[in-house]
C-alpha cells in the first residue's frame, strides 16, 4: 500500500504488469547487448484479464474527439485491439512497409 491509502487501479495495474512481465536472468537484447533484467510485454499481452484491464485503463486516456486508433504492426496490435474494444473506436494497423499482396 502507498502512503495515500489503498492502491488505486492504476497502481494495482502497474504492479500486476511488473509481476507478470519483469524477468531477471541473462538476456540478449535486440541490440546484442546483455542484460540481467527484461520486461517481456508478450507475457501481459497474452494474459486476457491483464490485457483487458490495461485496455480499459488506456481507454480513459483517449480524447473524446478521437475518431480512430492506430497501432504499429506486431508491437501494439493486441494492445490497440484491447483499447479499440473498450472505446468502440476502429483500429488502424500501421505497417513498417507496404506488403506486395492483398490489402
Where would I find each of the regions flagged by the language model?
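Conserved hydrophobic/aromatic pocket- or pore-lining residues that grip, position, or stack substrates
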Residues: 32, 69, 91
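Active-site-facing substrate-recognition patch
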Residues: 2-64
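Short glycine-rich phosphate-binding loop at a beta-alpha junction
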Residues: 65-73
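Fold-independent oxyanion-binding glycine-rich loops
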Residues: 41-42, 72-74, 95-97
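A glycine-rich, hydrophobic loop/mini-helix early in the fold
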Residues: 53-61, 74, 79-82, 87
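Gly/Ser/Thr-rich beta-alpha loop segments that engage phosphate groups in nucleotides
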Residues: 27, 34, 73, 77-78, ...
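Short, glycine/charge-rich flexible loops or terminal/linker lids adjacent to PRPP-binding catalytic cores
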Residues: 81-103
